[in-house]
Amino acid sequence: MKRIVFLMTLLMLGSEAAAKCSYSGTTTTQSITLSNLKIPTDPSIPVGSVLYTRKIGTGPYKNFECSKIMNDQYIIDISTPVVAGVTGLQGGPVYETGIDGIGFQVSDLLRSRNGHIVAAEAGNTLVPIEKTSQNYYQDVTIWLIKTKNVIDTSGTGSNPSVSYSVGNLTTNPKKGDRLLYTLSSIKFKDINYRNTSCNI
């Protein structure tokens, strides 16, 4: 009987170890200020159009090794709500910037690669890759999206944040352990609004 209990304990410990993601390195945290923007306010530009694009390098971020079989999760957190009724690039959701009429999308860190950028969607999904070495892409793209026909040019923004994590929610319960990369704030400064669709 003791031997059976011992074997069961070993099996349980072994399955837990297999389900637990492993990490090396540290989380990277950045903030960005989008300044001297030229934003067109031409009402003929359709809602859902890209008004501005900015690509930033993430630098090295935390390495991981997880397992799809063990249902390890990829978590994207975006601090602001979805703009209701508006879709942007790739038919994806657009998130509030705090400026009425302008939303944003951000690229998916683990699904994007050179020549193929994927717009991110907040939420939990199965890990798209099992280890960093399968796609260690080190750029994030931010798109500003038109969400209303009339943009409130007096708005200043709410400094939204975005984070990317991977892990097993049972065996890697600490959010800090799972966190790979955080864009801690997207700020806006000196926006130049122009009633034209040129010089975006």
Predicted regions and their residues:
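N-terminal export/ancillary region detector
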Residues: 20-196
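Charged, low-complexity intrinsically disordered boundary/linker segments
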Residues: 199-200
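Acidic/polar active-site rim loop that often engages polyanionic ligands
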Residues: 10
